[in-house]
Amino acid sequence: MNTQTDMTGSNEFKLNQAPEDGISAVKFSPNTSQFLLVSSWDSSVRLYDVPANTMRLKYQHAGPVLDCAFYDPTHAWSGGLDHQLKMHDLNTDGDTVVGSHDAPIRCVEYCPEVNVIVTGSWDQTVKLWDPRTPCNAGTFSQPDKVYTLSVSGDRLIVGTAGRRVLVWDLRNMGYVQQRRESSLKYQTRCIRAFPNKQGYVLSSIEGRVAVEYLDPSLEVQKKKYAFKCHRLKENNIEQIYPVNAVSFHNLHNTFATGGSDGFVNIWDPFNKKRLCQFHRYPTSIASLAFSNDGSTLAIAASYMYEMDDIDHPEDAIYIRQVTDAETKPK
């Protein structure tokens, strides 16, 4: 397996048959680190067998795919610029178009506690889908284009354009539980909920991350904070990079961030410190995913056209075995 290591050491390798264009999302199967789902601007969704380093299957959309999610080990859901939400049976390799949005679908997540698929779109709505039928189970207006969303137990945290954050209760979508403004000054790039369900992490295009808490009480809100990251001093000038990706370690509640500087950092939010930084990757980190057991981190290094169409390294997915020393609060 380590023949693919190329400069990365024995705890990391590169996946074969990577997508042919930008990588939009990497997601591990809910109960194993064996399978990884990857969506891409090449209009494909790919399923990889990670330990074997092989692509198991690939299915197509009519346009670039912006996000994907596992519903269960044998069903993938995905959406993108073709506005269509697809469910794909990974056993039979069969497609179902479940429904659509009026604009590109930016986010696809599964909520196990309520058993719904959630999609967020640039059409300024969130839609819920019943995966059993499968069919639409409701459409809910948001204040602006949906850029990111994350499921926390039975709650849904939505980040939109205009730096807005909304907290919804997936069991009762009749009204918004909380309306917030991002505590960061610049556009929201990614929101991910803490596995312990107490809060979320929000990253922006301007090299910053905020750690936020859901409980609105003053006592709890005092604990929130933000910090700078993914900034590099070059010739005495500070270069500031977008923080594109956040992924939580399910057991430790620590999290990884990936930026357009090509670095991945792991943070301890409780002691407010960085636990480690990996080597620099060849280009921007577009997406990150810890496996459910926290043993493995998938890292998508994929140019995000921050500087328009310049020559850039080919898109790649690195699979890294992580240790407690790198991920456990100290």
Swiss-Prot record:
The protein's superkingdom reads Eukaryota
Question: Which ranges does the UniProt record give for the WD repeats?
Answer: 8-49, 52-89, 91-130, 133-169, 220-268
Please give one Pfam family short name.
Answer: WD40
Keywords assigned by UniProt, alphabetized: Cell cycle, Cell division, Centromere, Chromosome, Chromosome partition, Kinetochore, Meiosis, Mitosis, Nucleus, Repeat, WD repeat
Cited Gene3D superfamilies: YVTN repeat-like/Quinoprotein amine dehydrogenase
**Transmembrane spans:** none
Q: Which cellular component terms (GO) are annotated to the entry? A: bub1-bub3 complex; kinetochore; mitotic checkpoint complex; nucleoplasm
Where is the protein localized?
Nucleus; Chromosome, Centromere, Kinetochore
Give any GO molecular function from the UniProt entry: ubiquitin binding
| One GO biological process term | meiotic cell cycle
Family to which this protein belongs:
Belongs to the WD repeat BUB3 family.
- Quote the function comment for this protein: Has a dual function in spindle-assembly checkpoint signaling and in promoting the establishment of correct kinetochore-microtubule (K-MT) attachments. Plays a role in the kinetochore-mediated mitotic checkpoint, which delays anaphase onset until all chromosomes have attached properly to the mitotic spindle. Required to establish and maintain spindle checkpoint arrest in eggs.
The record describes its quaternary structure and partners as: Found in complex with bub1 or bub1b (phosphorylated). Component of a complex along with bub1b, mad2 and cdc20 located at the kinetochore. Interacts with znf207/BuGZ.
- By what name is this protein known? Mitotic checkpoint protein BUB3
